[in-house]
């Protein structure tokens, strides 16, 4: 039993009270962006709200985004994992979870993230964001043929004047340099 934590309890209570206003501000494109301290308070307040309402999928997804913005891998991964467990068909939850896993320093997380991205590509091979994340993950995992295939699919989907095309074409060229002569045919 510990005493003297009044200040920490007060900070927690303030964060919980401020969370709705901070969230509104974070979602308003015209409002000032939240600084890191405000984002931390938002995360604390959101975690408290989600303890009261653990089935709030959108809340878990938003907490995952806040965790990513803070660079807090455990908050992001845990929040997205919870959202994904609640609704595996929710594309925002699945893609957020895959992104958090692929950014992890744990090779097993990277593998799981790659598997989830492969599932997402099979489900919707016209989602540019999914294809992009899949391609970069495949490249990082040295699966260069898969990366090239995903980037080529993106080129088919993007308009001719899209500025991303040049980056994708350079990425394809870089991946092709890593392929063996038999693979690049």
Go through each PLM region and give its residues.
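Long, contiguous interaction/recruitment modules in multidomain scaffold/adaptor proteins
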Residues: 1-44
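Alpha-helical adaptor scaffolds
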Residues: 26-35, 39, 57, 61-124
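Alpha-solenoid helical repeat scaffolds
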Residues: 44-47, 81, 118, 152
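Residue-level signature for tetratricopeptide repeat
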Residues: 49, 66, 100-103, 137, ...
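Structural marker of alpha-solenoid helical repeat scaffolds
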Residues: 52, 86, 123-124, 157, ...
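Alpha-helical linker/edge segments of TPR/alpha-solenoid repeat scaffolds
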Residues: 104-111, 173-185
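TPR/TPR-like (Sel1-like) alpha-helical repeat modules
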Residues: 139, 144-162, 170-173
